[in-house]
Amino acid sequence: MTTSPFSRIRARIDQSPPKRVNEPGTWQAAVALVLVLRPGGDLELLFSRRAERDGDPWSGQMGLPGGRKEEGDDGLLDTARRETMEETGVGLPPDALLGELDDLFPNIRVLPPVVVRPFVFGLPDRPTIAPSDEVATHLWASLGTLRESARVVEIEVIGRKQEVDAFVIDGHVIWGITFRIVSRLMDFLI
């Protein structure tokens, strides 16, 4: 009997309980890794490029749908679902949840003190995207293409050039905490 890629991902994530960070004085945030199974069996992942906004430390960056937990959210899973709906118009039903990954901090310490919890979802088909004004564009990238595109690139961070690990897809640079989250997901697929 064959199992679906989503069943395998769920089983692998279940075997490795996520590490949690409970750091006083930090914001809590959540992101959604939205996977879609393509014909031929490859998995694609949804990314968004944030709109350019003054005062937004992630302005113009490629990332995953998500954001800060709000008072009305019933936990971080609710945050991931709400933010994904707000930013992309994509609803994430309960049965689409495949699991949770380790909590992470951004490595750049001048950013707001935030702990990000990644949630992995699997959808049977590519949903229609209806981006909000928070999102400049979106991108679907196959995991195979992401693997092949991984490299070290030079970027400017807070006025300084530095080399970082990144995925480079169609001219979009995916680095930082997003690179680390996606790399962790790929660890479950090896």
Question: Which positions does each model-derived feature cover?
Answer:
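Acidic, glycine-rich loop-and-strand cores that form catalytic or ligand-binding grooves
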Residues: 131-139, 143-145
